[in-house]
C-alpha cells in the first residue's frame, strides 16, 4: 500500500523549553500516593485536603485541633464560645484507623535461616561443649567458643518455644539411643 502524500518533517528538539522546570512542575502537580489504604479509599479528588480530612474526622493542623488555652483571659471565661463541632461524614475511616492502631505490633526482628540451622547443628552434635563447637568443620566463620555461646543465647532469646521443643526432642532421642 502506498504511503500517504504530504509533508513528513522530522521532529526538532525544543531548545527553548526549560526541562528542569517542566519536570519539577509535573512532579508537583502529580498527586502523591496515599499510603494508608483506609484514607485512600475514602479520599475525594474533587475536594481539598482540609475538606477530605474534616469529613473523615481527622485534623489537618494538630495545633488547631487542640488549641492551647491562654491563661491571661480568666475574667472573660463566661463569654467564651466553643467552636461548633465539624460534621464527620465518614466516621468509618476513623474507626478503622483506631482499630488498626490498637492491634499489637508484629515482631520484625528474626534470625536468618542459616544461623538457626548452624545453632541447631552445633547443639545436636556437641551439646554444651563450646570448645568442640569451635573446632567443628562446620564452623565456617571460625567463631570462638564465646561467640558460639552468644549465638546460641540469641537463638534461645528469639525463639524460646522452638528452643524448648528442640531440647526436648534431643532428650527424647538421647533416651531412645541409651
Swiss-Prot record:
PANTHER family assigned: HSPC111 PROTEIN-RELATED, NUCLEOLAR PROTEIN 16
Subcellular locations according to the entry: Nucleus, Nucleolus
Gene name of this polypeptide: NOP16
Taxonomic source organism: Bos taurus
List of residues that carry N6-acetyllysine: 90
Similarity annotation: Belongs to the NOP16 family.
The keyword Nucleotide-binding belongs to this UniProt entry's keyword annotation: no
Cross-linked sites for Glycyl lysine isopeptide (Lys-Gly) (interchain with G-Cter in SUMO2): 74
Main localization of the protein described in the UniProt heading: nucleus
This protein's name: Nucleolar protein 16
Source organism superkingdom: Eukaryota
Glycoprotein in keyword set: no
Database matches in Pfam families: Nop16 (PF09420)
GO biological process, one term: ribosomal large subunit biogenesis
InterPro entries in the cross-refs: Ribosome_biogenesis_Nop16
Residues where Phosphothreonine is found: 8, 144
Keywords carried by this UniProt record: Acetylation, Isopeptide bond, Nucleus, Phosphoprotein, Ubl conjugation
One CC-aspect GO term: nucleolus
